[in-house]
Amino acid sequence: MAEKKLIAILQRHGSTLLNENNSFRSRMDPPLDKQGISQAEKAAENILNEGFKVKKIISSPLLRAVQTADIIADELGLDVEQNRGLISWDLGFLSGKNKDEYDEILNYFVDNPKSKVPEGESLDDLEARTFEFFNEEMKNDDLKVYVTHTSNVITVENLIHGNHDGRPESGETSVEPGGTVGVYVDSEGKYSTEVLFGVEEDATFGS
């Protein structure tokens, strides 16, 4: 079996009230709730105790991600850099809507990745900026923690597996709020992901 190296840590932000309400978060900007703060603190503890040689923490500019990143940064003694390359998929008019009630509408835009969500962006837009961001990031070997959102984690998975048809139905890795996913590359140049910490859940867009 080819040896593999951890090259990136994808950290999902902690939970917010909108998570509890089963709403599409997208570009809405709620703070972490009490559970979300605890999840971020646990993630920070896990990353520290594992002894990962983290050089930098980069966060989506949305508050829930920045708060998560700040908690981890305090534990690791690092600063946080914000980058819009990690911001959530802009779901436009779907933002704040209940997932169960609007799931079929979201799936239309997932199944038709070139179609822009009204007042938002297309899935292709999300994939393009995610690829551009990580393509630039992978030009150096520093291990970094990227604090981001479910849709971004799924998009990284899709890029790794060459799945460009939208639906995350190929066994992609996703975790509950506060969970941590590792991105690896082996000696043959093959990329993979695995859950480092947290509870795995079905991968669904819209977080």
What are these regions, as identified by a protein language model?
Residues 6-79:
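Active-site-proximal alpha-helix that buttresses catalytic centers in soluble enzyme cores
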Residues 8, 140-151:
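Generic beta-sheet signal
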Residues 17, 64-66, 88, 152-155:
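Short, active-site-adjacent cap segments at secondary-structure transitions
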Residues 31, 74-131, 206:
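Phosphate-handling substructures
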Residues 50-53, 137-143:
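Glycine-rich phosphate-binding loop signature in dinucleotide/nucleotide-binding domains
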Residues 51-85, 107, 158-161, 184-207:
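Conserved histidine-centered catalytic loops in small-molecule metabolism enzymes
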Residues 59-60, 128, 147-148:
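Short beta-strand scaffold positions
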Residues 164-193:
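Domain-level recognition of soluble alpha/beta enzyme cores
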